[in-house]
Regions:
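Conserved interaction-surface patches within small, structured recognition/assembly domains
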Residues: 47-48, 63-69
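Small beta-strand-rich domains/subdomains or short beta-sheet motifs embedded
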Residues: 68, 74-77
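Non-catalytic terminal segments and appended small domains
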Residues: 1-60, 74, 86-153
Length: 153
């Protein structure tokens, strides 16, 4: 697992740096998507997350969910044109999961991409993700990631 300023980036995920999201390839043509550790730190304590409806088709750059914290309300944008085939019901009942487990229990939606070959070039992993987020954090003048009690990545 890579780490930048106490912000964790698991090696087995793909990232879209600008949207501050991760994608996990499920090996069946679907991807789970969620917010990065950096995004959950920027948002602060998340109090609500509402995903778009299952079955909805979303275009790259559009919102798949809205997240609300004490200091921020905003969209979670998808880097892939896709159909939302599932949403994480656990976070609908307890949005703090996005803070305590952004990469494990905190997936937001499951996507079935329709233009993966055309759009996957914007996703990064490994050293490219690390360098991309270093630049992102520097440009946004972000310090260290903050982890809640019980944080498990």
């Amino acid at each position: 697992m890579a780490e930048i300023n106490n912000c964790l980036l698991p090696d087995d995920l793909q990232y879209h740096v600008e949207y501050n999201v991760w994608l996990r390839d499920n090996g069946d043509g679907t991807f789970d998507m969620g917010m990065t550790d950096i995004a959950q730190t920027m948002a602060g304590a998340v109090i609500h997350c509402r995903a778009k409806a299952v079955g909805k088709n979303v275009k790259k750059g559009k919102s798949v969910a809205t997240v609300e914290s004490g200091k921020w309300v905003g969209p979670v944008k998808t880097p892939l044109t896709a159909e939302i085939i599932a949403s994480n019901q656990d976070i609908e009942g307890d949005a703090t999961i996005l803070n305590t487990s952004p990469y494990k229990q905190g997936w937001i939606v499951r996507l079935k991409p329709s233009l993966l070959e055309e759009e996957k070039g914007e996703l990064v992993s490994g050293e490219d993700a690390l360098e991309g987020f270093k630049t992102y954090m520097s440009e946004k003048e972000l310090g260290e990631c903050v982890h809640c009690e019980g944080f498990d990545g």
